[in-house]
Every structure is written in structure tokens, then in C-alpha cells.
Amino acid sequence: FCLKDTDRVFGAHRSHSHILSLDISLHAFFSEILGRANGLSKGLGGSMHMWDKKNGFHGSVPIVSGTVPIALGSAFAAKLDGNKDIAISYMGDSAMEEGVVHETLNLASLMQLPIVFIVENNMFGSHMHISERQSSYSTARYADANNIKKIIVDGNDIIQVINAINLLSN
């Protein structure tokens, strides 16, 4: 794929697809959801608190945008270490309404950190259509505001997603 074993992925509050995109054990994944001790987080994390450090998945939390600044810290550490690792930060369109996301985007751009932000825009959040919450359907405008390279793709097309991550992480 497009990630190295040492890259780090930070999921959002609905991150089953994020962790399933990595080289994880499906048995351990489903065991976690069922609360079994042989799960990814020993059955203690459940669906919204998955963690698999061995495969580069550094967590998901039920707090909208909760892992975004943590991913930024990971990217900062990679830059300080001088390696070529990147952080992947997943979030939904509602996360774009959180102040911490704007602070993170600004700092990532200012410091030229090795991070790729993936915004899954399904046009709904908090039971509201995006038109009732934001002045534009496009969450990509926040990348423009922070001078961050962006690529808009159909998230259901895995080849487009892989190509976009490859382009943005190089």
C-alpha cells in the first residue's frame, strides 16, 4: 500500500474502516468489538477505543476531532526524529467545526509537518445536513485557508484514496 510500517494512523469516532485498512487480525478486531480478552485492546476498548500499535493504529476515540491534535504531535515527533514517517489523521465533516482542528491545521502548515488529513465528508453530522451547519459543502476550503495541499477524491474508490495519500505524503 501507501504506508510504511512505521507510519501512524489516528482514527476518528467511527474508525472501523480505518483500522481494517491496515494489516490487522480480523479475529482480534471482532474479538475487540465483542469485548473478548484476545481483542486488539484486550476487549476493553470496544468499538470506539480500538488500538493496535503493532500495526500503526494509534487509536480512535468517541470525541469528534479527539485524535486530530494527537496525530499532529506524532507528526511533530517524526519531524524532530528526522525520519520519513507520516501521520494520517481521519476526521468527519463535523470535526471541521471544532476549534482544535483549525489550530491543528494552522500549526501543521506553519511547521510543515509530515501529516495527511483525511476528511470523510458524508454531508451529515449531529443529525443535521452540512447545509444547516456550514456555509459551504466543501470542507476542502479549510486546506486552502491554511495553505495545505489538498486532493478531493471519491472515498469509495480505494485506488483514488491510495494515489492521493501517496501524492500528499511525498
Where are the regions a protein language model picked out?
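Thiamine diphosphate
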Residues: 119-170
